[in-house]
């Protein structure tokens, strides 16, 4: 591995690609480790230079110099981390087990470096007299707080304990993610009788047949990936099969196998609690919320409980309506279980509004939706998108676009990655391969490279990729995040784009979701993939009318996730109990459907155990409150109004 020369390793030197994009076509697994080790070495040398600078510590020679350090390491780690989520394999995951502790150790070596912190503190203590710009003040504030929040004020045994705990945590979160992906990929429900498929739309049956065929099997294979799981739960008439698939999904990482996350959940929660207490906080939520708009757990609980009170009566009425419909079909003793909810909700929606996802799907062909979403950005901001096949990508399904601003200046690179794969984790997210910053020496505005990653319905042999309305909303959501990243315009990369308070970060994404039911927007792209017919006004009106169908139940579900998150991270004593029982107690006031004791959300709740949302899941609802206010201006002034945008 270490025989690779710098010249052979694509991470070294300048990328010879359009806009210096990542040369994915040249990167192999063996390139990561030597580049990361060299990146650590280079940043250590840069930090030594800051410490050994004979000049008195000032903003330029300490704060800015630290901000600019670690360029090679950042470059490699951004690719490595993103590949672990979007295009991983056994070799990469094995390497991650070796690399992640090294990165944790390196991070600790920086924040626990007493001489470096002394210089940072020296500048911070003079902040009132330095006449800094607003950006410079923010950078200084962030740098100082980051050191303090990562153990710089700890001494002796406490410092060593902090090192130990943070290294353990990096391994635990990695294991959690890997187990989740492997457990998801390991399950398949193979059906061999045609009658088992009753109720399922043709496109779903075709996709299941292709999944089975790709593995040399006869029949129809259904998986735990959203484009397979969600339609099955919504349309399959066979209740026993819905039950089977539901249980497979909702007991992920709880089984007696190597993918079990029960102990890992306990360890992550306990380790975060210990880190927070070591740093002087009563619990992990208090530690996290100190740097959020919400500021403390009282404000979070106030929001969650207010919303809980507001949603519950309507959600209970929604449940009653669905239950009544089910009893008309199944008899008065029938009790709706969680594996029945989507099925009967969909039937009721169809009955009330004469609309369902499959009715809309032919109008949402992926290429057309993409044109519509890109066109919306063009109308609002004047930006344009140009596909560039010369830009290397990490998988044949990924596309790369150059994005230009209204003056025709290069703005950003946008990668799009739409469909599920074995090496891709579940969900949808926006990420970056390169942040934006302004080069101090040349004045050049170095533009960002952004990616949106989804798990949308795949094309089949007979049909293009036809999205559900829910997938269209998801596209708009993640595209909102990408706009936030692409419009970044800061001097410093650590302040640019989505590097904002976490409970603000969901605002741009949720504003974009609002466009999904706007007739003027839908008319720009929604065409039947076979006939070219525009989405009829009558269908749009039904879509608008149905947009609040069972919305209270859906909101209550989000509240339940927020309550579960806070239950794990407001603990101030270690947890040694039963994870499933604790979970059921934590969110019981937000549950309307009967509890299924064997199920567990925590073991697969990547947002709070492996992502950035620990003690932060409430931020979706926080941003919704802000977003309702913000979008009302578009409604008032016109949805394509550039002045509002």
Language model features by range: what are they?
Residues 72-82, 141, 145, 247, ...:
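Short, hydrophobic/amphipathic alpha-helical patches that form generic packing surfaces
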Residues 3-200, 206, 634:
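N-terminal helix-rich structural modules
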Residues 135, 139, 163, 168-171, ...:
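Active-site-proximal, well-structured secondary-structure segments within enzyme catalytic domains
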Residues 4-31, 38, 214, 219-221, ...:
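C-terminal, non-catalytic "cap/extension" segments appended to globular domains
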Residues 16-31, 80-99, 122-164, 223-263, ...:
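Short His/Asp/Glu-rich catalytic/ion-coordination signatures at enzyme active sites or charged loops
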Residues 41, 45, 49-56, 72-89, ...:
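Intrinsically disordered or highly flexible coil/loop and linker segments, enriched in small
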Residues 51-55, 83-88, 236, 244-245, ...:
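Membrane-interfacial helix termini and the short, flexible loops that connect transmembrane helices
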